[in-house]
């Protein structure tokens, strides 16, 4: 949402360049985040992630695109929260809000399925 004085509120329309930049920053943060989580993750946290994966999978089978987009983004927030770094969690949440808008604009169902499969691979690697 973009607020413009004397004009009102508008939905932000990210450019292709902004989309690339957002995903580049996410890649850097999420790669390091996953590396740091790997040696300290608990069985309980793995179970929590597996439950989230089941919810993602269910969301892919219905037509609620916004809901599935939110769940796919939430996966990364769950990982960040597990590290206990509130600054990282907040920064990632802000990036995910931007990338979710991009996903709503451009992500196909096939691409969403591939994202969910990547999440499964991440949890498998963490386990």
Language-model-derived ranges and their functions:
Residues 1-6, 10-13:
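Beta-hairpin "wing" of winged helix-turn-helix
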Residues 9-12, 39, 81:
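Helix-turn-helix-type domain boundary/helix-start signal
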Residues 18, 22, 26, 34, ...:
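Conserved amphipathic alpha-helical segments that form helical-bundle/coiled-coil interaction surfaces
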Residues 30:
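Mg2+-dependent prenyl diphosphate-binding active-site environment of isoprenoid biosynthetic enzymes
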Residues 111-113:
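Active-site loop of classical SDR/Rossmann-like NAD(P)-dependent oxidoreductases
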């Amino acid at each position: 949402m973009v607020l413009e004085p004397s004009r009102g509120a508008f939905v932000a329309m990210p450019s292709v360049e902004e989309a690339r930049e957002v995903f580049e920053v996410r890649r850097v943060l999420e790669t390091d985040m996953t590396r740091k989580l790997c040696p300290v993750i608990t069985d309980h946290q793995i179970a929590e992630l597996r439950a989230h994966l089941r919810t993602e999978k269910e969301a892919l089978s219905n037509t609620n695109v916004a809901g599935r987009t939110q769940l796919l983004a939430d996966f990364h927030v769950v990982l960040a929260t597990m590290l206990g770094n509130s600054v990282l969690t907040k920064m990632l949440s802000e990036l995910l809000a931007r990338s979710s808008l991009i996903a709503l604009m451009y992500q196909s169902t096939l691409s969403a399925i591939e994202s969910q499969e990547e999440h499964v691979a991440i949890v498998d690697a963490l386990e």
